[in-house]
């Protein structure tokens, strides 16, 4: 049976380190790290995410500001708000909760955030720094950064000689995850919906990362014996065993099957998810240090 990787415990240790770092910064400079979270519309899942981010920011001792805008907000109005946050020296991190309502050009909004305040790591500049191997001066997308910390907890910092397969090529996760693994010297294969003979590709992986958004797609026989499996999927499915109309969260990996074969595996929930918010806090305290001319902490 695989070791179940405890994302909650790792996230708690990261947020405690962030809290101490924020405390020391405030003691020295008299400045709290400032995080502004912007949400548009009424999507309940987005509101739940934003509330947990704002709550965690307060626990870390940040100046946490939430802007909740109505569904009918215009592109121009949102761009104006981002512009104001860009020039506000008390705000070190800006996060616009995605997905935005359909009438928005999300990319224009995201790219309008100053790269040094882009704590989601989605600006072209931050993505480019990661792609060129600069892990020191940019901000790295939170979910891959968190997943990578879990990988390093199992394998250490140097992944030389290990094969890694990432299923999923999104800008939000797949591409930056591939870059992080590559920067740690893994041999990386990027797989996706058009990959030929996906099962065979996956079976080569010492580190298998699934981020496709399809419940239990990765079966036990896709997993190389002794592999580390990182499950980034969050899928809500019906759970009649819990009662009529009930649902549960599952990942992209068939957990019971895969955990019989793998050496280590992340659960859903409680694996990569908690790491995402922890790394958002880490990025915010890093951005605050840089803004104040201080050497940023490492996590």
Swiss-Prot record:
Known EC number: 1.5.1.5, 3.5.4.9
Keywords: Amino-acid biosynthesis, Histidine biosynthesis, Hydrolase, Methionine biosynthesis, Multifunctional enzyme, NADP, One-carbon metabolism, Oxidoreductase, Purine biosynthesis
Entry's family note: Belongs to the tetrahydrofolate dehydrogenase/cyclohydrolase family.
Provenance organism: Agrobacterium fabrum (strain C58 / ATCC 33970)
GO CC annotation terms, alphabetical: cytosol
Pathway(s) this gene product operates in, as recorded in its UniProt entry: One-carbon metabolism; tetrahydrofolate interconversion
Catalytic activity field: (6R)-5,10-methylene-5,6,7,8-tetrahydrofolate + NADP(+) = (6R)-5,10-methenyltetrahydrofolate + NADPH; (6R)-5,10-methenyltetrahydrofolate + H2O = (6R)-10-formyltetrahydrofolate + H(+)
Keyword match Disulfide bond: no
SUPFAM superfamilies: Aminoacid dehydrogenase-like, N-terminal domain (SSF53223), NAD(P)-binding Rossmann-fold domains (SSF51735)
Name of the protein this chain belongs to: Bifunctional protein FolD
């Amino acid at each position: 049976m695989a070791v179940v990787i405890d994302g909650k415990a790792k996230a708690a240790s990261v947020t405690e380190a962030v809290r101490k770092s924020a405390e020391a910064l405030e003691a020295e400079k008299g400045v709290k790290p400032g995080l502004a979270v912007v949400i548009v519309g009424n999507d309940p899942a987005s509101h739940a995410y934003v509330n947990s981010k704002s709550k965690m920011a307060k626990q870390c001792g940040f100046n946490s500001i939430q802007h909740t805008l109505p569904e009918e907000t215009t592109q121009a109005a949102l761009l104006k708000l981002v512009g104001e946050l860009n020039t506000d020296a008390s705000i070190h991190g800006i996060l616009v909760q995605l997905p935005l309502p359909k009438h928005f050009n999300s990319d224009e909004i995201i790219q309008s955030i100053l790269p040094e305040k882009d704590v989601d790591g989605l600006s072209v500049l931050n993505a480019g720094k990661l792609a060129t191997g600069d892990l020191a001066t940019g901000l790295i997308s939170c979910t891959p950064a968190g997943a990578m910390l879990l990988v390093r907890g199992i394998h250490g910092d140097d992944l030389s000689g290990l094969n890694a397969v990432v299923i999923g090529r999104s800008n939000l996760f797949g591409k930056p995850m591939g870059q992080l693994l590559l920067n740690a010297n893994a041999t990386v294969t990027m797989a996706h919906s058009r990959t030929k003979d996906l099962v065979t590709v996956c079976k080569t992986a010492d580190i298998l990362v699934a981020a496709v958004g399809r419940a239990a797609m990765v079966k036990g026989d896709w997993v190389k014996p002794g592999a580390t499996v990182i499950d980034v999927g969050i899928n809500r499915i019906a759970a009649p065993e819990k009662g009529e109309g009930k649902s549960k969260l599952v990942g992209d990996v068939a957990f019971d099957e895969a955990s019989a074969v793998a050496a280590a595996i992340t659960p859903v929930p409680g694996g990569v998810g908690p790491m995402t918010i922890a790394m958002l806090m880490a990025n915010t305290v890093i951005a605050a240090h840089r803004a104040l001319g201080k050497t940023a902490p490492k996590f």
